[in-house]
Amino acid sequence: MTSHIATETSVNRWSTEPVVREEGRPPGPEDFPSTKQGREQDGNVIGITPNYKIGEQKPNSELNLGKTGSLPRGSGDYKMTYRQEDYKQTIIDPKVITNANMPYISTRIPDPRRNLAGDFPSEHSKSKIKLDPLEQRRFRSSESRPITTSNYLAESVDRHREMEASRLREYLKAKENEANQPWNKPGWPGPKKNDESLRELETMKQRIETLKRDANKGPVNAELDELSKRAEELRKRDGWSKYKLVESDIYKTDPDPMPANIKDQVRDLLESRNSVETTTTQRDHDKSGYVTDVSTATWNFSTVDYSPRSVVSMNGASHDILKDDKPRSIMKRNDLVRREQMLYPTVDTQVVKSVVKKPTVTETVQRFEETRRTEEVERRVQRREKKERRSRHHSSSRHHSGWEGHTGGYQGHRSSSLSRGGHGGGGQETYYRQETTRRQQHNNYDDNFNRGIAHARYGSLSDSLRRGELQYVPNGEVRQSFYRDGSNGGQRMHKSYSTRDVFTGDGYDDRRSVSSFRRGSQQQVSPFVEFPPTLPRRGGGGDYRREEDAYFRPVSKSRSYADWDDAGRAGMGREVRRYDDDMSRLEAEFRDSLLMPMPAGNMNERDHRTEQLPGGYETFNKERHANSGRRSGRDGKPVDFNEATQEYNYKREQTLNDDRRRR
């Protein structure tokens, strides 16, 4: 495993505008003035560390270098003061370049006091919320794979191959002619940590760097250096040893060593994780029996000093006085490795080989998409003669003839089962109610006439439920705001869970008309009787059983949402067949009205969300438009219009790989 530190250092310099203050009249040359000049410099260093790195309240530390020089205090006829502030900002950005298996969240210090309850999934790399699909795929490709048998075996084979190529094997290998010889091999050399020549090399490097720096140095600011030394003495007394001063340069010292418990935590964290490119080298096997070499990966978990971006601003300096001292241990380790390679030329183990195995089953993508569109348009003309029209249709013969003509065209197929049959009438192409889309605000009887089974007092079940005229509790009461005075006002009505028909009995002894579609709850005296499903529906006697219904027609769904009927089913001929179709239409419509209630008034809303799922994403789109108002129609009468459109789109795409499905 290779890892080294690279630091990017950027320096910004800027100055404020010079401020010149004059007092008195400037002297002329004939005045023979005596002039006193003075100069004063002020230095201040501020080191800023992000607060979450150190866990302290104060994230910055200031170092005041004090003033140098003095200004003359004497009085004079003319005084000129010139003031300018120079700033220099040095940004040191250390980066680790490594192929160790480091989680991306490792830039934060693990807090041992942090309880598990605050460990949210969004803080880990598996959460890819608020990412577009391309970014999600990129994350998924670099995310950790589960340890499967094939992966484990492949890694173990690679490990054995690398051991075959190692120098230790060459060293331990015995030749045939040495079989009977005594063991006289020299001791395993291995890398020596405290090599004297290596130390000399390091000091030579430092001398060369110092000479280079002296050659490139600008004019020496002796006063500032003197002040720096004084400040260093003061800091020694304060016991602040975070910086060390070499000549006129301030170096950061090494951070405190990491506590052992945190190191163990990090080691566990790292060793339980596999990356996509698992590369191992001979050095790592010497150190640990595991794939990951943790010791090189945990260097940056410093409890005090490490931050991804340390910002230091400096006032009044003539050259760079803040430099980053590279951590020695890693540099020494790299030098050791290089020197070892020079001494013992072998196969280069530093090259990262990434072998990508192609899986047998690549991926299974699940796609799910649902789109719905609902439109509702209401036009209501203001009428004068409401009461006359309302009482016009109360004779049974008019109703009956209307029904005969209205249901005649629906004999061939079940009119409203559009989702089942795939064929419908001309006005009913869509899944939703299209036959007549008026919403009845003040139920004109004339408007409600001939609309289906639920037409007696309201346009449709979902409309009346939405308006609050009728409260439906599935096996409870049907409460009506009107007809409270009737004998049936609070009667409990049963919801049928079977496909059996529910009748009122006694062959219509109360002489109600066959097609009286008014909600005559006062007339309904007889109890509810359920026919057993085994009996044929053609019973004895009674003018309400028609010949068209001589065969047994099973109903496709149990009647769930509205099992109350208008005046006890009102006959068994065409009306019953139409009743079943209207029931399925009403159920679909009631469900959709609950799912997507229509907006009222003027509205233009758009809701779009994309959420991240494990292995995929889902999008949800909803648009609602509505407008209402009043305009004059063609004949000049005022028309209240109310239009609403809703579109709903839900899409889910998910990738399932074999490992996830197997578990």
UniProtKB/Swiss-Prot annotation:
UniProt GO BP: embryonic morphogenesis; hemidesmosome assembly
GO CC, alphabetical: apical plasma membrane; basal plasma membrane; cytoplasm; cytoskeleton; hemidesmosome
Biased composition (Polar residues): 1-15, 517-526
Effect of loss of the gene: Embryonic lethal with failed embryonic morphogenesis. Disrupted intracellular structural integrity from the 2-fold stage of embryogenesis resulting in thickening of the epidermis, abnormal intermediate filament distribution and detachment and collapse of muscle from the cell body, particularly in the head, tail and midbody. RNAi-mediated knockdown results in developmental defects whereby 95% embryos do not undergo morphogenesis and arrest before the two-fold stage with abnormal head and tail structures and reduced motility within the eggshell.
Basic residues: compositionally biased ranges: 381-400
Keywords: Cell junction, Cell membrane, Cytoplasm, Cytoskeleton, Membrane
Expression tissues: Isoform a: Expressed in the uterus, the vulva, the rectum, mechanosensory neurons and in head and tail neurons. Isoform e: Expressed in spermatheca and weakly in the vulva. Isoform f: Expressed in spermatheca and weakly in the vulva. Isoform i: Expressed in spermatheca and weakly in the vulva.
Stretches with biased composition (Basic and acidic residues): 367-380, 620-640, 649-663
Disordered: region residues: 1-78, 367-430, 517-546, 597-663
Quaternary organization: Interacts with vab-10 (via plankin domain).
Protein name, as recorded: Protein pat-12
Species of origin: Caenorhabditis elegans
